[in-house]
């Protein structure tokens, strides 16, 4: 499993057949280490034997090993069956075993130097097809499981555990790390391999079902990466009307955990621990959605689009509901905040029945808890509120702000920030946990995004406008997130989108909503039963009796067996929670201590092999991060040569700069319309000294004020020294001049003043050798964080430069050019 041991990930697989045996040859990312897995099926095909024939082989020994296998076999020859990128598992129905392989993949996200892949194509390999018992039941099962569309919304990673949150990864030492099988959809398929090679083996690759998306906020050239991960629970999974409410073991229908990760994309790797200062800083926030945890259902009919809701079982002790909330306490801690969005007033009671019963359940459970541990319940009829003049987003904003303050969010430490933990979770639901729930989760995500950006030093206050590029980008991500979850559970895309609740584009959103309503009704009427059968087969929730397949019986048998063995004990109805789960002080203490233990962990030399493959040629057009959906707006064309040689960041795609950089956090409606306006006088001006057909713009005018200042001769001289291949070629069309809004200028200053260590100059003589080295590295590699262009900064830089030379004379040649250019830069600024 990923991230559980020190074994190198296996990223490519070749399946060979030799008589009755199968050999899987795997290799690491650099194709330097190989491992071999042997699979043998019994004569009766009811059992299978798996062993690791060779653990570590180099290429030369691999060839010798394969030749030896062929020589030892009298009449056999190794036959290449297929190639794959992941082993998803082994399973059987009524006859022999099938091997499940991922044959095509695509990178969709990069987290901490770990690639996350989407499954594009899969293949079933029948072991021993010559003895195949092609019964009608076998054919039906195989046909059903192929209907589970693995070319959609299934994800895996070789080296990153997608089943766990980032906070868990940072606060649990790697030897104690455990995969959450609740979100591993191929868990039953991996069982034969797990039993043979162990859970820590890189042969076992967990598969999650849900949604993964990644985008980039360009903040004056600095990439801020936003990642959205949705994990769907495999327990009580299925179609909308066939999976409602809660199961007896506390798992609910349509249960999804959504994690919003925001980090500085300037560096790739994770910090060593959450409490150790590191670059970059990682932040995350987790939300939860799931069906109302009561025993309820809907009598589905092909005639009625909204079947009546009925409560199947009134438990006076709410035992299943108690198990559900105790599990939430165990995963996330306290407080557990319930945001219930079902309707409260209806002509014919449907959703309101669940509202009353849910309130009674929480009141009953809370009476046994301390005030600080109680479930915090918020009921709000979002459907009724959307019909009023006041936008529902305003009310949700207030709720979201209070929720985030109570739960906090996870953030790793840096030099000036100790780091924080998320303690507690918000559980959002409506009747389907689709449309209203997704809109509410977006508003909470928007509120958290502002807080995360503030922790990263991008914003000075946790406020974001809906019309800004950053929020629009986040809204698109949550829209895709909601569509994926709705398609998996309801059979259609979102019926009511965020635009519906914000009352934007009413005509287009209304027509779209009607179309999706029809699609959902059709899916629920004619397709859901087939989908439910396929999902049950895929998850292994069936039992074979001779040649008959019975669904659902396997789980009940396992539950009965646990009761018999004493592994499952009925809880006291008054003490329904686990005490250690609600001990917040102990949880935080343990998390901090476990995080400290990670400080001694050293990343292996092959840490980046999956992201930056050393034995293959790759281009920027093929790498994910430069091609992410982004708010990127570019600086003016005339600034490229200067920025490439200056200390300022550059957002450059290699094809030229298209437009001035705009602040992604300013509302678009407030942007000055004449920003790109070209005056008639400017059109008649002569070409500048560089023979470009556009007017040069001063760097200082762009950054600090709106008055044009001349570029220093030294800089112009340096521009002519740039190789022709690095210069931006002149264009036939003249580039317009522009004015930078003061808001952009102020935010730019704030952004690059954050975590500025140039203030250490006053106490340089008192600094330790370690801090001096840090400052020298800063001056050498990160001079883009200089607060202002002043003469004292040059003196400070020279002081550190001279001190560094005295400690390491070899640095003189490396720094002299930078100091000279820096001096010319300041001289030019003073002269203007």
Curated annotation (Swiss-Prot):
Domain SAC: residue ranges: 145-491
InterPro entries the UniProt entry points to: Fig4-like, SAC_dom
Catalytic reaction equation(s): a 1,2-diacyl-sn-glycero-3-phospho-(1D-myo-inositol-3,5-bisphosphate) + H2O = a 1,2-diacyl-sn-glycero-3-phospho-(1D-myo-inositol-3-phosphate) + phosphate
Pfam families in the record: Syja_N (PF02383)
GO cellular component, one term: PAS complex
GO BP, one annotated term: phosphatidylinositol dephosphorylation
Membrane topology: Peripheral membrane protein
Key words, A-Z: Cytoplasm, Hydrolase, Membrane, Vacuole
Signal peptide per UniProt: none
Subcellular location, principal: cytoplasm
One Gene Ontology molecular-function label: phosphatidylinositol-3,5-bisphosphate 5-phosphatase activity
Cofactor: Mg(2+)
Subcellular location: Cytoplasm; Vacuole membrane
EC number in record: 3.1.3.-
Function: The PI(3,5)P2 regulatory complex regulates both the synthesis and turnover of phosphatidylinositol 3,5-bisphosphate (PtdIns(3,5)P2).
Subunit structure: Component of the PI(3,5)P2 regulatory complex.
Entries under PANTHER family matching the protein: POLYPHOSPHOINOSITIDE PHOSPHATASE
Name recorded for this polypeptide: Polyphosphoinositide phosphatase
Native organism: Schizosaccharomyces pombe (strain 972 / ATCC 24843)
């Amino acid at each position: 499993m990923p991230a559980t041991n020190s074994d190198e990930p296996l990223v490519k697989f070749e399946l060979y057949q030799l008589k009755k045996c199968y050999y899987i040859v795997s290799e690491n990312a650099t194709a330097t280490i190989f491992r071999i897995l042997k699979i043998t099926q019994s004569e009766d095909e009811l059992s299978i034997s798996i062993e690791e024939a060779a653990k570590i082989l180099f290429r030369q020994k691999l060839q010798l090993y394969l030749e030896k296998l062929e020589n030892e076999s009298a009449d056999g020859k190794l036959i290449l069956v297929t190639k794959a990128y992941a082993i998803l598992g082994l399973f059987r129905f009524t006859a022999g075993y099938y091997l499940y392989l991922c044959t095509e993949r695509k990178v969709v996200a990069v987290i901490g130097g770990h690639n996350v892949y989407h499954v594009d194509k899969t293949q079933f390999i029948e072991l021993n097809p010559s003895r195949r018992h092609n019964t009608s039941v076998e054919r039906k099962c195989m046909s059903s499981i192929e209907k589970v569309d693995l070319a959609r919304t299934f994800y895996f990673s070789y080296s990153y555990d997608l089943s766990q949150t980032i906070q868990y990864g940072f606060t649990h030492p790697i030897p104690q790390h455990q995969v959450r099988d609740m979100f591993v959809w191929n868990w039953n398929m991996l069982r034969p391999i797990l039993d043979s090679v162990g859970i820590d083996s890189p042969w076992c690759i967990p598969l999650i079902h849900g949604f993964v998306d990644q985008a980039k906020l360009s903040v004056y050239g600095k990439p801020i990466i936003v990642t959205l991960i949705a994990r769907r629970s495999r327990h009580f999974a299925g179609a909308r009307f066939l999976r409602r409410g809660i199961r007896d073991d506390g798992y609910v229908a349509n249960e999804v955990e959504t994690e919003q990760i925001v980090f500085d994309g300037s560096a790739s790797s994770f910090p060593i621990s959450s409490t150790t200062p590191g670059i970059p800083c990682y932040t995350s926030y987790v939300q939860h959605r799931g069906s109302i945890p009561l025993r309820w259902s809907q009598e589905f009919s092909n005639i009625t689009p909204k079947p009546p809701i009925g409560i199947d079982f009134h438990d006076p002790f709410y035992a299943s509901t108690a198990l559900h909330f105790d599990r939430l306490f165990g995963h996330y801690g306290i407080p557990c905040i319930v945001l219930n969005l079902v309707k409260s007033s209806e002509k014919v009671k449907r959703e309101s029945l669940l509202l009353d019963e849910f309130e009674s359940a929480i009141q009953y459970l809370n009476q046994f808890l301390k005030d600080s541990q109680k479930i915090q319940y918020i009921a709000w009829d979002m459907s009724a509120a959307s019909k009023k003049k006041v936008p529902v987003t305003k009310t949700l904003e207030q709720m979201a702000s209070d929720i985030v303050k109570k739960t906090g969010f996870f953030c790793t430490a840096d030099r000036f920030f100790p780091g924080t933990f998320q303690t507690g979770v918000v559980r959002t639901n409506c009747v389907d946990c689709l449309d209203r729930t997704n809109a509410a989760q977006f508003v909470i995500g928007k509120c958290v995004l502002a807080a995360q950006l503030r922790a990263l030093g991008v914003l000075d206050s946790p406020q974001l406008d809906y019309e800004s590029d950053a929020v629009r980008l986040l809204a698109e991500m949550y829209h895709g997130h909601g569509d994926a979850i709705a398609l998996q559970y309801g059979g259609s895309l979102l019926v009511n989108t965020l635009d519906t609740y914000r009352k934007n584009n009413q005509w287009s959103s209304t027509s779209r909503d009607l179309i999706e309503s029809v699609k959902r009704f059709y899916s629920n009427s004619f397709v859901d039963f087939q989908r439910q059968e396929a999902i049950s087969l895929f998850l292994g929730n069936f039992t074979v009796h001779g040649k008959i397949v019975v669904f659902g019986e396997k789980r009940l048998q396992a539950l009965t067996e646990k009761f018999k063995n004493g592994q499952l004990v009925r809880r006291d109805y008054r003490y329904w929670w686990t005490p250690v789960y609600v001990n917040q002080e102990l949880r935080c203490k343990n998390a901090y201590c476990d995080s400290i233990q990670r400080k001694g962990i050293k990343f292996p030399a092959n840490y980046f092999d999956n992201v930056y493959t050393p034995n293959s040629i790759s281009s920027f057009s093929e790498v994910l991060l430069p091609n992410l959906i982004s708010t990127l707006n570019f600086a003016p064309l005339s600034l490229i040569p200067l920025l490439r040689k200056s200390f300022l960041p550059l957002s450059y795609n290699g094809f030229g700069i298209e437009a001035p950089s705009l602040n992604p956090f300013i509302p678009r409606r407030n942007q000055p319309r004449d920003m790109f306006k070209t005056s008639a006088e400017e059109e008649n001006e002569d070409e500048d000294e560089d023979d470009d057909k556009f007017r040069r713009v001063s760097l200082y005018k762009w950054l600090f004020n709106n008055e044009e200042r001349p570029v220093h001769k030294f800089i112009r001289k340096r521009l002519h020294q740039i190789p022709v291949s690095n210069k931006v070629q002149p264009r036939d069309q003249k580039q317009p001049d522009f004015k930078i809004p003061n808001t952009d200028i102020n935010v730019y200053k704030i952004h690059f003043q954050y975590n500025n260590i140039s203030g250490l100059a006053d106490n340089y003589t008192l600094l330790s050798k370690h801090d001096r080295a840090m400052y020298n590295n800063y001056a050498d590699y990160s001079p883009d964080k200089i607060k202002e262009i002043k003469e004292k900064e040059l003196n400070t830089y020279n002081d550190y430069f001279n001190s560094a030379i005295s400690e390491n004379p070899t640095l003189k040649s490396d720094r002299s050019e930078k100091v000279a250019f820096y001096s010319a830069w300041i001289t030019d600024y003073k002269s203007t």
